[in-house]
């Protein structure tokens, strides 16, 4: 596909308004040294450009835009609406959010506005309109960046009133609400819309973050995601009313729980996101999150933020080791990014982000390790130009990721507090990552026909239409892999009666009678037909085969001998049911069989400790070969002879790759 950009955007957040003019001039020289070609500006400038209710002052922003335009930078223009000016909060305190404990916030920090405040909406839309009018003719503005990292929660009266409106639109009648939420439980029946209150610590969620009514709490999550999305759309539409062909985005946050990003992506021209792994985040988790961001629109995405060196807000803000930032950046491109952008370009001198990494450090020179590594990456990206732009990642495997399931599964008050949705998804993704098998992260309403294998771990909530969609996929020859805690509830978190796994029971060929929860110090053992045994933990389904072939059984406890892994023929395809959390080797045993029988393989045949990820154009395949391990690895023989896009030299059989080494090898198709 054609890229939305003419070059790889390389730059990041830039706040010259925090510095005197002589620093601006020095920055321009340093940016050229680092081969930086883009800047994200105006992210938190609302107070500067609108100093009072009826006054705008664009003088400084005009100077910044002119400076960057004269230097031929691609500008990412933010709308500044993520941090409210003090005058607004003073005059209109209702613009601030009310937190989980029922306390209304005062001025300060960010991520604390009420998305259902009509005052906030009015002034945010007006500001976006003024910015679009003022800079509509500037050809250097490549992207419009709405708000910043939408997040936070509000439980104020405005939100409560709008929640009731949202419910009326969704359910039409109170009888339908009562039925969906099963309000006969604990005598919660509603007879008037005004009786419905927001679910927070003062109401349904008063016990340790869990909820008395997951149906109510999950609906509030849906409502709040929609409320935030409406704010985004309000500003987006204001910009597009002036600039119809504007490329509009907002920066997402990976597996952030608060917002349904698949729904958001439908309203975004391009997905962008901020990547901040911790010092101990597995590289497979980083890769999975990139794939999720790519999967939101099934298109290349923008990396809007990463740090060139260290964060400031995690528990342990370790430095990126020499070569790590470069390798991490290439992993980002490998999984679908068409931009590499940092937060930030010059390190802040004050505030809570003064220790957050930047291209230009507090010493204020270009003679630092981080600057030199940034410049090296900039030179390399500039040298191979547009060749990777718009190229696609192709996959035979899809993994379902669904925010409704994310919310509902973690709201449920049983059977274990240790069940975490993202961890379960990653447990399966990691197998494919280690095998260098390309994966698409897909929504429940995606096109399943593109895949040979679909994994749906902990598909707890099977909503309307999902059963039929999955059945059609399997009947047509697809392989479905699902697990414990699947098929349990409907879209309102009411149990599918008739035995677990509910709507999946027929195609899986099993009936789950009970679910045993194992404490962290407990485990069981699973034995396969060849006698090989593997540990399992967390949960154990006690299930009965109803036509499915038993591949493995439990070895201990009163359910010893009962099935732990099954395989069922359904139409032309197969359904694997994994009834417990298997250790990695045991899961690999199951997934090896599932992938081999439908000829799903890695991007190369050889086994290797290197990550190898592919992007393709119509006539070229690019192999991104990266070493994220502590060991040296030899380049797989099948890649020898291909030209490295970075060096221009042909790779040789026996080439040794040290930790953080990267090659981008080209193959003509």
State what each model feature region is.
Residues 102-270, 274-291:
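Polysaccharide-binding and catalytic clefts of secreted carbohydrate-active enzymes
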Residues 18-33, 124-130, 253-264, 321-329:
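Short, acidic/polar
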Residues 12, 31, 39, 68, ...:
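Conserved, mostly hydrophobic/aromatic
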Residues 26-32, 40-103, 132, 235-242, ...:
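Aromatic-lined substrate-binding rim segments of carbohydrate-active enzymes
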Residues 6-8, 35-37, 69-75, 137-142, ...:
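Short, well-ordered coil/turn segments that N-cap beta-strands
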Residues 9-19, 44-59, 106-125, 147-154, ...:
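The substrate-binding groove and active-site-proximal loops of carbohydrate-active enzymes
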Residues 1-23, 28-38:
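An acidic-aromatic substrate-binding cleft motif
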Residues 196-200, 245, 254, 265, ...:
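Carbohydrate-binding surfaces of carbohydrate-active enzymes
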């Amino acid at each position: 596909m054609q890229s939305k950009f003419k070059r790889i955007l390389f730059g990041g957040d830039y706040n010259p308004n925090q510095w005197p003019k002589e620093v601006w001039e020095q920055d321009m020289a340093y940016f050229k040294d680092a081969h930086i070609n883009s800047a994200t500006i105006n992210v938190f400038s609302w107070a500067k450009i609108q100093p009072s209710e009826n006054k705008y002052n664009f003088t400084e922003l005009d100077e910044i835009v002119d400076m960057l335009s004269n230097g031929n930078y691609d500008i990412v223009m933010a709308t500044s609406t993520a941090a409210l000016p003090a005058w607004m909060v003073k005059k209109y305190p209702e613009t601030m959010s009310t937190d989980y404990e029922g306390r209304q916030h005062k001025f300060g920090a960010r991520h604390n506005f009420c998305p259902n405040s009509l005052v906030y909406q009015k002034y945010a839309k007006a500001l976006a309109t003024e910015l679009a009018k003022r800079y509509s003719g500037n050809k250097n503005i490549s992207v419009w960046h709405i708000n910043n990292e939408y997040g936070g929660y509000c439980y104020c009266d405005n939100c409560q009133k709008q929640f009731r409106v949202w419910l009326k639109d969704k359910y039409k009648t109170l009888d339908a609400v009562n039925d969906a939420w099963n309000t006969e439980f604990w005598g919660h029946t509603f007879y008037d819309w005004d009786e419905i209150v927001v679910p927070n610590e003062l109401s349904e969620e008063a016990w340790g973050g869990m909820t008395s009514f997951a149906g109510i709490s999950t609906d509030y999550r849906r409502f709040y995601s929609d409320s935030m999305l409406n704010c985004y759309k309000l500003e987006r539409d204001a910009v597009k009313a002036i600039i119809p062909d504007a490329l509009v985005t907002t920066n997402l946050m990976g597996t952030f729980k608060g917002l349904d990003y698949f729904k958001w992506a439908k309203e975004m021209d391009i997905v962008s996101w901020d990547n901040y792994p911790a010092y101990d985040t597995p590289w497979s988790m980083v890769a999975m999150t990139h794939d999720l961001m790519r999967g939101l629109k099934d298109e290349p995405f923008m990396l809007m933020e990463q740090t060139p060196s260290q964060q400031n807000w995690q528990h342990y803000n370790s430095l990126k080791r020499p070569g790590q930032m470069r390798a991490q950046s290439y992993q980002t491109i490998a999984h679908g990014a068409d931009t590499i952008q940092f937060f930030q370009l010059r390190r802040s001198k004050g505030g809570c982000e003064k220790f957050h990494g930047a291209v230009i450090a507090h010493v204020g020179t270009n003679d630092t390790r981080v600057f030199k590594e940034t410049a090296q990456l900039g030179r390399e990206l500039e040298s191979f130009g547009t060749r990777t732009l718009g190229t696609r990642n192709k996959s035979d495997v899809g993994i379902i990721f669904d925010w409704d399931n994310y919310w509902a599964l973690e709201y449920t008050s049983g059977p274990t507090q240790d069940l975490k949705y993202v961890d379960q998804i990653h447990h399966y993704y990691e197998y494919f990552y280690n095998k260098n098998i390309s994966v698409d992260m897909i929504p429940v309403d995606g096109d399943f026909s593109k895949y040979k294998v679909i994994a749906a771990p902990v598909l707890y909530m099977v909503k309307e239409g999902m059963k039929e969609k999955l059945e059609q996929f399997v009947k047509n020859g697809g392989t479905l892999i699902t697990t414990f805690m699947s098929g349990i509830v409907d879209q309102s978190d009411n149990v599918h009666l008739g035995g677990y796994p509910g709507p999946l029971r027929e195609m899986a060929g099993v009936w789950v009678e009970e679910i045993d929860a194992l404490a962290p110090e407990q485990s069981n053992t699973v034995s396969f037909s060849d006698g090989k045994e593997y540990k399992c933990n967390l949960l154990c389904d006690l299930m009965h085969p109803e036509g499915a072939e038993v591949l493995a059984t439990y070895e201990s406890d009163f359910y010893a001998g009962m099935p732990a892994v099954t395989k069922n023929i359904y139409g032309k395809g197969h359904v694997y049911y994994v009834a417990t959390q298997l250790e990695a080797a045991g899961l690999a045993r199951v997934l090896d069989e599932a992938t081999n029988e439908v000829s799903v393989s890695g991007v190369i045949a050889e086994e290797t400790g290197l990550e190898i990820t592919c992007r393709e154009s119509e006539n070229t395949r690019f192999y991104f070969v990266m070493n994220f391990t502590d060991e040296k690895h030899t380049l797989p023989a099948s890649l020898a002879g291909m030209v490295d896009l970075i060096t221009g030299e042909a790779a040789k059989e026996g080439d040794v790759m040290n930790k953080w080494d990267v090659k981008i090898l080209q193959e003509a198709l």
